[in-house]
């Protein structure tokens, strides 16, 4: 995959439920702590190395932001770091929260 792909909240949820991907949330710490998708990894400059050490490069990664815009740059960056399959979640957290479970606090 040379470029990230777009994925709907529904398709992302199916991949995650099947254990076929990891979800990362790139929103600011306060927004993440207030509410985030269940099981999301809070990806920041400070947690990037840990994520890369924990998640194999052949594991599909789904990137979530607020509305689906910022996630595109982050998705492309993860591809450049060596991840094979990266998706930007269309509609971001706002699309996710309309359909699927969210939680508060640190994940």
Swiss-Prot record:
Chief location: cytoplasm
Enzyme class name: transferase
Keyword Cytoplasm annotated: yes
Active site (record annotation): 65 (cysteine persulfide intermediate)
Reactions it catalyzes: thiosulfate + hydrogen cyanide = thiocyanate + sulfite + 2 H(+); thiosulfate + [thioredoxin]-dithiol = [thioredoxin]-disulfide + hydrogen sulfide + sulfite + 2 H(+)
Domain called Rhodanese: residue spans: 17-101
Similarity remark: Belongs to the GlpE family.
General function of this protein: Transferase that catalyzes the transfer of sulfur from thiosulfate to thiophilic acceptors such as cyanide or dithiols. May function in a CysM-independent thiosulfate assimilation pathway by catalyzing the conversion of thiosulfate to sulfite, which can then be used for L-cysteine biosynthesis.
Protein name, entry field: Thiosulfate sulfurtransferase GlpE
Organism expressing this protein natively: Aeromonas hydrophila subsp. hydrophila (strain ATCC 7966 / DSM 30187 / BCRC 13018 / CCUG 14551 / JCM 1027 / KCTC 2358 / NCIMB 9240 / NCTC 8049)
């Amino acid at each position: 995959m040379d470029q990230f792909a777009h994925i709907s909240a529904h398709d992302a949820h199916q991949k995650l439920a099947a254990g076929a991907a990891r979800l990362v949330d790139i929103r600011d710490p306060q927004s993440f702590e207030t509410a985030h998708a269940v099981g999301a990894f809070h990806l920041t400059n400070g947690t990037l190395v840990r994520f890369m050490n924990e998640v194999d490069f052949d594991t599909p990664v789904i990137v979530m932001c607020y509305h689906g815009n910022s996630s595109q740059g982050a998705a492309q960056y993860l591809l450049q770091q060596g991840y094979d399959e990266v998706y930007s979640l269309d509609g971001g957290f706002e699309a996710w929260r309309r359909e699927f479970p969210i939680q508060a606090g640190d994940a």
